Amino acid sequence: MADSPRVCVQVQSVYIEAQSSPEDERFVFAYTVTVRNLGRTPVQLLGRYWLITNGNGKETEVQGEGVVGVQPHIQPGGEYQYTSGAVIETPFGTMQGHYEMVDDQGNGFHLDIPVFRLAVPTLIH
């Protein structure tokens, strides 16, 4: 499968303090992903692969069908956005991965998701 310049992805993460418990080494993050179809043909997101790395270098792999229970079709010029979450044992870490995509001709491709940070914000006084 080849990378496709026709589809792009953006990710934004946020620390969820209310669901976290630092004393129990539980740090909860939400991340919002936007997938934009910049091409001329519809595409569908079939599956996902994530590599989650905590601040100690511990890696967790997550893969499965679709995202948040769906395999969205994205029309030309359209986008699909969803929010999900990750729990790690340290106040910082990273995520990266790819989506398994297919166009309307049945051509499969990987949409790479560049590394992004999961980090508890630092308070500045």
Curated annotation (Swiss-Prot):
Domain ApaG span(s) in chain numbering: 1-125
Organism in which the protein naturally occurs: Cronobacter sakazakii (strain ATCC BAA-894)
InterPro entries with a match to the protein in the record: ApaG_domain, ApaG_sf, Uncharacterised_ApaG
Domain of life: Bacteria
Disulfide topology: none
Phylogenetic lineage: Bacteria, Pseudomonadati, Pseudomonadota, Gammaproteobacteria, Enterobacterales
Protein name: Protein ApaG
Pfam families cross-referenced by the UniProt entry: DUF525 (PF04379)
PANTHER family on file: F-BOX ONLY PROTEIN 3, POLYMERASE DELTA-INTERACTING PROTEIN 2
Transmembrane feature ranges: none
One Gene Ontology biological process: error-free translesion synthesis
